[in-house]
Curated annotation (Swiss-Prot):
Subcellular location: Secreted
Gene Ontology molecular function terms on file: identical protein binding; metal ion binding
Presence of the UniProt keyword Cytoplasm in the record: no
Record organism: Mus musculus (Mouse)
Protein residues bound to Zn(2+): 53, 57, 138
Gene Ontology biological-process annotations: chemotaxis; negative regulation of Wnt signaling pathway
Family of this protein: Belongs to the LECT2/MIM-1 family.
Gene name per UniProt: Lect2
Tissue: Highly expressed in liver and weakly in testis. Not expressed in heart, brain, spleen, lung, skeletal muscle and kidney.
Keywords, sorted A to Z: Chemotaxis, Disulfide bond, Metal-binding, Secreted, Signal, Zinc
GO cellular component: extracellular region
Name of the protein in question: Leukocyte cell-derived chemotaxin-2
Free-text function comment from the UniProt entry: Has a neutrophil chemotactic activity. Also a positive regulator of chondrocyte proliferation.
Disulfide bonds: 25-60, 36-41, 99-142
Lineage: Eukaryota, Metazoa, Chordata, Craniata, Vertebrata
Signal peptide boundaries: 1-18
C-alpha cells in the first residue's frame, strides 16, 4: 500500500509540471506546441525569415473554442498584422502576474474580467490565409519572454 503523503506529493508534482495555465483549446486535451510545417515552427524563438518567433503556437482546430489560460482582465484588442485579413485579431490578457497577447481568435469581448478556463473566443480560419499550416493559437508574453513553461 502506498502512503497517502506519497500520492499527494505525486499529484502536486504532476500539476506543477503541467504548468499553471489552463488548457487553451477545446479541440485538444492538452496545450500541444505546433511542430514544423512549410510555414515554420511553433516553438518559442524559432527562426523566421527576418526574425525569431516571439511566442508559442498552441495547436487548435479552426473554429474551436479558445479558453482563458488564467484568471485576469482582457485589457484590449491586439492585432498581429498591419493588413486586414481573416485572422488579424486577438487580445491582451493580464492577471496573476502574467501578461499575454493571444492571436488568431475572435474574442467574445475586448475588455473585462475573465476566469481561468472560461471561453475567451473562437479560433479564426488560419487555413484560409495559410493553407496546410497546423492551425494554432499564438500565445506571446507581453515582455517577449518564453511562455512555454506555463503551458
Amino acid at each position: 500500500m502506498i502512503p497517502t503523503t506519497i500520492l499527494i506529493s505525486a499529484a502536486l508534482l504532476s500539476s506543477a509540471l503541467a504548468g499553471p495555465w489552463a488548457n487553451i483549446c477545446a479541440s485538444k486535451s492538452s496545450n500541444e506546441i505546433r511542430t514544423c510545417d512549410s510555414y515554420g515552427c511553433g516553438q518559442y524563438s524559432a527562426q523566421r525569415t527576418q526574425r525569431h518567433h516571439p511566442g508559442v503556437d498552441v495547436l487548435c482546430s479552426d473554429g474551436s473554442v479558445v479558453y482563458a489560460p488564467f484568471t485576469g482582465k482582457i485589457v484590449g484588442q491586439e492585432k498581429p498584422y498591419r493588413n486586414k485579413n481573416a485572422i488579424n485579431d486577438g487580445i491582451r490578457l493580464s492577471g496573476r502576474g502574467f501578461c499575454v497577447k493571444i492571436f488568431y481568435i475572435k474574442p467574445i469581448k475586448y475588455k473585462g474580467s475573465i476566469k481561468k478556463g472560461e471561453k475567451l473566443g473562437t479560433l479564426l480560419p488560419l487555413q484560409k490565409i495559410y493553407p496546410g499550416i497546423q492551425s494554432h493559437v499564438h500565445v506571446e508574453n507581453c515582455d517577449s519572454s518564453d511562455p512555454t513553461a506555463y503551458l
